[in-house]
Each structure stands twice: as C-alpha cells, then as structure tokens.
Amino acid sequence: MLKDIYERSLSGEITIEDARKLLEANPFELFDTADQLRKEIVGDNVTYIVNRNINFTDFCVGTCKFCSFKNNKGFRLTLDEILQRVGAAKETGSTEVCIQGGLTEDMYLEDYAGMIRAIKSKYDIHTHAFSPMEVYHMSRMSGVTVEESLKTLKVAGLNSMPGTAAEILDDEIRSVICPGKLSTSEWVDVVSTAHRVGIPTTATIMYGHIETWEHRLKHLFIVRDVQRQTHGITEFVPLTFMHENNSLSGKSMGASGMDDLRMYALARIIFGRDIPNVQASWVKLGTKLAQVALNCGANDVGGTLMEENISKSAGSKSGEYLSPDDLQAMIKAAGRIPRQRNTLYKLLG
C-alpha cells in the first residue's frame, strides 16, 4: 500500500501532481491503496439498487460521435407506454426509474415536467431523470433559464438527476467527440444549479476514446471541485467507451482492462471522503471485471436496469438485466457483503 497517498486521500489533500505520479506507480500497489481506502471510508458492504431504465426516445438532434443509440430504431414512447413501464418496475420491487432520452425538436419543459407529474400521480417511486444536456436543451427550447427548468422539474416531482453528458470535461476533446453539446462550464453550471435547488445528481466520466490520462485526471478534479462546493453528488460512475456502431470506433477500441481498474483506483484516491460511492457498472465492464473493480476502489454495482439500450447499441454483451439474486451472488463471489440501497444510498432491508 502507498501509505502517504492513503493518508493524504483521507485528509483530502491529493493534488493533480500526486495523481500524475500514481500513473507510474506499481498498479497492484495502486489498487491495494484504493481498496484500503474503500474499506476505511465505506466498509465491506457493496450496494446495488433495484431499478429500471426507461429510454423514452432515440430520436435526437445531437451530434455525439460516440453514440450508437441515436435514431437506431426510430422510436418514441407515449406517456401511457412510459407509465406501463413504471408500473412493471413497481411490480418487480423497483425503488427507482431512471428516465433519459434523445434531444428532440418538439419537446419542451412542460413535456418533461408533465412526464414526471404523471408518474408521481400514479406511483410512489423515485424519479431519477434527465441528463444535464436534456435540461440544457429543454431550457433553450422553452426560452427559460436552467434554474427555472430545474425548479419546475423539482416541483413536478423530480427527485434526482443522472450526471451523464459529462463525457470528458475538456472543451477541446468535446469539440471533437460531441460538437454542439453543452460545454464543460455549462455542464458544471447545470449540475451545480441542480444541487442548489435541492436536486442531487450523480457524476460520470466516459473514457477510453481520444482523450489522454491528463484529460481524465483534470475531469476528476473538476468533479471533486463541484462536490466540495455543493455536496450534491451521490456517486461517481466511470463509463468505459463502447466502440461498436459509432463514428469514433475507428479511432479507439476502448480502454484496456488495466486502465479500467486504474480509473476506479484513481477515482477512489482523488475523491477520498468527498465522494464516498464509486460505482462499477456491470453493463459496461461485464460482471467479472466489475468484481475485480470491487477490489480496486469501487463499492457499488449499480442496478438491475431491466432494459438498457444505449450500451447495447454500442456493442455491450453484458445484457440488460440482472436480478437482485444475480447481483447478490456476484457481490458475494467477490468476497463482499451485498446490501440493497435506494438512489440516495440509504440501505434498505
């Protein structure tokens, strides 16, 4: 274990210079340090959530070059179809629905707020919905500020937001992989404003394409800075780039397994106590590498999902659904204690 790094992480003193040096460290010492930090900060529980993803449309005016989901099937769910999916989620014990969709030219703030109101009027379930880009887009379409949109969504019943659309928080990289998407400062503004009006979010990174480790490290420190200012980030979710069926596939085959594990370890070390929850996405990594990530800093495996269209369209072979029993078995096989949680990391049962 890297004792000095361990101590400085716990006291919140890790610098970007430290992180650069850690890239040259013995990887197994790096992983062990992250694992010991995980044990100190959150213990041996590994959490999961019973939830359902609902992607309500793949129509999108966006230009993200890493996306394999846009206009793939050409669908848009009606409100009744969305409600049917929420009802099915409730019947199977879901505590959360995660709702995201493409950016359309005919949906406005009231459409998004109406969707949340309709769900909340019929079901007692946590709504985790709409990426920062969706909020930015609906605000522009409706001629209102981001803060006005977020306040309207909160009144409608929005409980939390996914911190997706972060990709790499570097405008030079963003101009290549997602031209026209909200900028780094705009992503920070949407997320920080959400926290200010009482909507917690997650935070993500989508790595393994054209960016360098320097870009990744800067991204992690931007996220840490946001958390230190707002304290509204519930978890950090590294998303390894899925390279099939998109225009970035010729530039990268994605991150190596070792780089995936370095990402989890560095996130744990850099965030320390600031963001205690680091999620290993079984959809992105597969169950076996997700188990390894649990020994490299991660303490959560995400959700049951029930349906997952975005990673699947980009070549994920990990499936769309794992039952609670499946997730518990995966966690136990990694030598850890499975615990069900809600969206805000309250343990259930």
Swiss-Prot record:
The record ties this protein, via SUPFAM superfamilies, to: Radical SAM enzymes (SSF102114)
> E.C. number, please?
2.5.1.147
Gene3D superfamilies linked: Aldolase class I
A GO molecular function annotation here is: 4 iron, 4 sulfur cluster binding
- Which residues of this UniProt protein bind [4Fe-4S] cluster? C60, C64, C67
Q: How is the cofactor bound?
A: Binds 1 [4Fe-4S] cluster. The cluster is coordinated with 3 cysteines and an exchangeable S-adenosyl-L-methionine.
Pathways per UniProt: Cofactor biosynthesis; coenzyme F0 biosynthesis
Top-level enzyme category: transferase
Name the Pfam families for this protein: CofH_C (PF19288), Radical_SAM (PF04055)
UniProt entry keywords in alphabetical sequence: 4Fe-4S, Iron, Iron-sulfur, Metal-binding, S-adenosyl-L-methionine, Transferase
* Domain Radical SAM core intervals: 46-273
Q: Which cofactor does it need?
A: [4Fe-4S] cluster
Q: Which reaction does it catalyse?
A: 5-amino-6-(D-ribitylamino)uracil + L-tyrosine + S-adenosyl-L-methionine = 5-amino-5-(4-hydroxybenzyl)-6-(D-ribitylimino)-5,6-dihydrouracil + 2-iminoacetate + 5'-deoxyadenosine + L-methionine + H(+)
Question: Which PROSITE patterns does the record match to this protein?
Answer: RADICAL_SAM
Describe its assembly: Consists of two subunits, CofG and CofH.
Family per UniProt?
Belongs to the radical SAM superfamily. CofH family.
Instruction: Briefly state the protein's biological role.
Output: Catalyzes the radical-mediated synthesis of 5-amino-5-(4-hydroxybenzyl)-6-(D-ribitylimino)-5,6-dihydrouracil from 5-amino-6-(D-ribitylamino)uracil and L-tyrosine.
What HAMAP family does this protein's entry cite? FO_synth_sub2 (MF_01612)
Q: What is this protein called?
A: 5-amino-6-(D-ribitylamino)uracil--L-tyrosine 4-hydroxyphenyl transferase
**What species is given as this protein's source?**
Methanocella arvoryzae (strain DSM 22066 / NBRC 105507 / MRE50)
Give the lineage.
Answer: Archaea, Methanobacteriati, Methanobacteriota, Stenosarchaea group, Methanomicrobia
What is the primary gene name for this protein?
Answer: cofH
